């Protein structure tokens, strides 16, 4: 399969630079997987689409203020984007500079350059950085870091983004990008879903900066997926198995929840799914056999991205590309701060190729 098979025309005017004033008031395009039928509505229509006993699986990662600005002690300006917190003193990061720093290079970070750090090692495209500061890494990031808005949101981050680019149920700090399907849930909607009898469970996948990297090969099968840390605890496994046993659906909120659950299913030895704690490089594209997910809530993704490939593997290639064409025609808002889709599984998708 060719990467260009997943391309589509997207006017810049449809890229959302700010979220809707009310989280749950975004538009919702529903795609019926087996038939390809499309319906238009608003996000709160989920109340009618979900049944008592259905299980929503959320990603409770919390976005950290992962973008730092500063300079090398020798003078050159740098931008640091944290990929992962290694411990209380060290991070793994992308560093943008006119000349890549060498091990031992001193870095002065923050608007006032008051935070001292040292680049200690290089791991491929990533740099290991150690802070020379008594505070834990997370405290330093909260003090001097900027919210790492995606590259297609072409504006500086604002104070409001610290709340808006965060799900209301975020709990475990570690992501450098929000699991954006979850941004549409507010407390009243969550309360209404619970009232209806919809079950909820929480995985953790710390979204890395690799999620924004373009696919740089021509053939999908040649792409090497970036690695991200995921946790699927026993209580999630129990909730999934219980939902399946009673004939209810497992509904993933976002592609990160999909990748977490499917990673846990791939690693399972005997059961459908088992607990999973570790790095995952799962790459889902047409031909993949889904094991756990029955429905998916997700935003609209970039052309030629691994995420539109994941959706195509779930709903079917033709149905997915037709839905995106319709979304563009109907002027849906795209990407992180944009509108959402509700998609049910297409069992024929596994045999469909572009």
Swiss-Prot record:
The keyword S-adenosyl-L-methionine applies. NCBIfam families: PRK00147.1, queA. InterPro entries: QueA, QueA_dom1, QueA_dom2, QueA_sf. Its EC number is 2.4.99.17. It comes from Salmonella paratyphi C (strain RKS4594). It catalyses: 7-aminomethyl-7-carbaguanosine(34) in tRNA + S-adenosyl-L-methionine = epoxyqueuosine(34) in tRNA + adenine + L-methionine + 2 H(+). Its main location: cytoplasm. Pathway: tRNA modification; tRNA-queuosine biosynthesis. The lineage of its organism: Bacteria, Pseudomonadati, Pseudomonadota, Gammaproteobacteria, Enterobacterales. One of its GO terms (biological process) is tRNA wobble guanine modification. This is S-adenosylmethionine:tRNA ribosyltransferase-isomerase. Transfers and isomerizes the ribose moiety from AdoMet to the 7-aminomethyl group of 7-deazaguanine (preQ1-tRNA) to give epoxyqueuosine (oQ-tRNA).
């Amino acid at each position: 399969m060719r990467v260009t098979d997943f391309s589509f025309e997207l006017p810049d005017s449809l890229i959302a630079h700010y979220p809707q004033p009310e989280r749950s008031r975004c538009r919702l395009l529903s795609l019926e997987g087996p038939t390809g039928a499309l319906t238009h509505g608003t996000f709160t229509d989920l109340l009618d689409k979900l049944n008592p006993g259905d299980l929503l699986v959320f990603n409770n990662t919390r976005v950290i203020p992962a973008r730092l600005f500063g300079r090398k002690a020798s003078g050159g300006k740098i931008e640091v984007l944290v990929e992962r917190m290694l411990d209380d003193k060290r991070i793994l990061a992308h560093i943008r500079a006119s000349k890549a720093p060498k091990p031992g290079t001193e870095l002065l970070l923050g608007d006032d350059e008051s935070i001292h750090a040292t680049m200690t090692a290089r791991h491929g495209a990533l740099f290991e950085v150690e802070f020379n500061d008594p505070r834990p890494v997370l405290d330093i990031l909260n003090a001097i870091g900027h919210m790492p808005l995606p590259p297609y949101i072409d504006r500086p981050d604002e104070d409001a983004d610290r709340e808006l680019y965060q799900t209301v149920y975020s709990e475990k700090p570690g992501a450098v990008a929000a699991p954006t399907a979850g941004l549409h849930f507010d407390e009243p909607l969550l309360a209404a879903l619970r009232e209806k009898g919809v079950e909820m469970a929480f995985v953790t996948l710390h979204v890395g900066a690799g999620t924004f990297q373009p696919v740089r090969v021509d053939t999908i099968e040649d792409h090497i997926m970036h690695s991200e840390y995921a946790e699927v605890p026993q209580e999630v496994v129990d909730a999934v198995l219980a939902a399946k046993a009673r004939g209810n659906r497992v509904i993933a909120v976002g592609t990160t929840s999909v990748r977490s659950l499917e990673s846990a299913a791939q690693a399972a030895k005997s059961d459908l799914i088992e607990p999973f704690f570790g790095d995952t490089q799962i790459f889902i594209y047409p031909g993949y056999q889904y094991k756990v997910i029955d429905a998916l809530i997700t935003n609209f993704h970039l052309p030629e991205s691994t995420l539109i490939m994941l959706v195509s593997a779930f709903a079917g290639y033709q149905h997915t590309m037709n839905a995106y064409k319709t979304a563009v025609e109907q002027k849906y808002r795209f990407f992180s701060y944009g509108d959402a889709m509700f998609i049910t599984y297409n069992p024929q998708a596994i045999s469909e190729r572009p």
